[in-house]
Design a protein with these regions (language model features):
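A short glycine-threonine-serine/GTX helix/turn-capping micro-motif
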Residues: 96-105
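Conserved PLP-binding catalytic core of the aspartate aminotransferase-like
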Residues: 20, 127-137, 142-178
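Conserved PLP cofactor-binding pocket of PLP-dependent enzymes
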Residues: 176-191
């Protein structure tokens, strides 16, 4: 039918590090004349030849209607963005109440984000180092018998299985080693 349709999905899922089947979802969207809205917030700056994310890495970014990213995480600033056609961006700019009634990024934050995006776009050494460190962490966890969910992204879920123990481990890592780890417990994830 002619009803507007949109498929919203993420490229990298933050809790388990899985990646989505972007090509298949884009094909499904084309089949049903739906827009695609891809969240690349866990991937921009870290994947793709220019840090554009998983879709760029797979050569699929031109087939996505709307790509959402963040200026936090890899870029180390604050704020977010969408990359889309002029028509879609103008529509959001003119009709999106969340956009209309929000405060613009402070100039210093915008400048920092601009420099970070430009740097990561043209210099892949940090992306390579980040992937190497994630791989090293996975190898060390396996060698130590620490249960992790296997995946091919930088996200390394450690499966503790007990909420209280998870909190104690995270606090110990922070107190003794200065390492902050975000604990994720039930009900955010299954028991």
């Amino acid at each position: 039918n002619d009803r507007p349709k949109i498929i919203v999905f993420e490229s990298v899922y933050s809790l388990d590090g899985d990646t989505s089947p972007i090509a298949g979802i884009a094909a499904l969207a084309r089949r049903y004349s739906a827009l695609t809205y891809l969240g690349e917030v866990h991937a921009v700056g870290m994947y793709g030849a220019e840090g554009g994310g998983i879709a760029q890495m797979r050569g699929l970014d031109d087939g996505i209607d709307i790509i959402q990213g963040t200026l936090g995480k890899a870029f180390g600033a604050s704020g977010g963005y969408i990359a889309a056609s002029d028509v879609i961006c103008d529509t959001v700019r003119s009709n999106g109440s969340g956009f209309i009634f929000t405060t613009a990024l402070p100039p210093a934050v915008a400048a920092a984000a601009h420099v970070a995006v430009r740097h990561l776009r043209h210099d892949g050494t940090l992306r390579t180092a980040q992937q190497r460190q994630a791989s090293r962490l996975k190898d060390c966890a396996r060698a130590a018998g620490i249960p992790i969910l296997e995946g091919d992204t930088h996200i390394v879920p450690v499966m503790v299985g007990d909420a209280a123990a998870t909190m104690r481990i995270c606090q110990l890592l922070l107190d003794d080693h200065g390492i902050y780890v975000q604990p994720i417990n039930y009900p955010t994830v299954p028991r």
